[in-house]
């Protein structure tokens, strides 16, 4: 009888030790993932949330309200190679004509290739979505732009990345679009 109790105690002890190792391993893994927090940025009538692995960056457009970039992609000039740019332009015509004219002008660039276009919704507002590629200083880039109208202004939220980084970072853009607040 003592032999069975001893064997049972040893098995229980080993089981408890194994559980402790498994638990500490899981805690270590989740600890490294918890380093990313959610940031908020509000400007120009838009409020967004994004992961802390991205940050505010310089934009190259005159119409830019704000821009965020993946932190490890920001160059010496402060411009991110993987970025989301938020722009606002006054409408000089109706919204549909404005969008069509914008993409007609872009077609004069021989590197511009429209991948897809269609209707979408952003924060409950009707929107247009365009996905296209272009060549910027020898770097092939893919872009996803979502356009909407508010108060006589055309807004565009555009994600841009080198082709080899586009898909792997697209989830951040999709998260921003799904959570954006238009004020």
Predicted regions span which residues?
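Conserved polar/disulfide-associated segments of primarily extracytoplasmic proteins
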Residues: 59-156
């Amino acid at each position: 009888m003592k032999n069975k109790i001893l064997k049972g105690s040893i098995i229980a002890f080993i089981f408890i030790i194994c559980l402790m190792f498994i638990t500490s391993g899981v805690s270590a893994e989740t600890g490294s993932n918890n380093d990313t927090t959610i940031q908020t940025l509000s400007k120009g009538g838009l409020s967004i949330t994004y992961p802390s692995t991205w940050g505010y960056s310089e934009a190259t457009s005159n119409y830019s309200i704000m821009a965020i970039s993946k932190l490890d992609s920001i160059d010496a000039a402060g411009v991110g190679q993987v970025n989301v740019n938020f722009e606002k332009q006054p409408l000089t015509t109706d919204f549909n004509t404005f969008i069509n004219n914008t993409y007609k002008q872009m077609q004069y660039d021989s590197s511009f290739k429209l991948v897809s276009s269609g209707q979408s919704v952003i924060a409950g507002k009707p929107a247009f979505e365009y996905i296209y590629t272009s060549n910027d200083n020898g770097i092939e880039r893919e872009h996803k732009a979502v356009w909407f109208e508010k108060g006589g202004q055309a807004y565009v939220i555009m994600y841009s990345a080198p082709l080899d980084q586009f898909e792997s970072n697209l989830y951040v853009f999709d998260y921003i679009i799904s959570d954006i607040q238009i004020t």
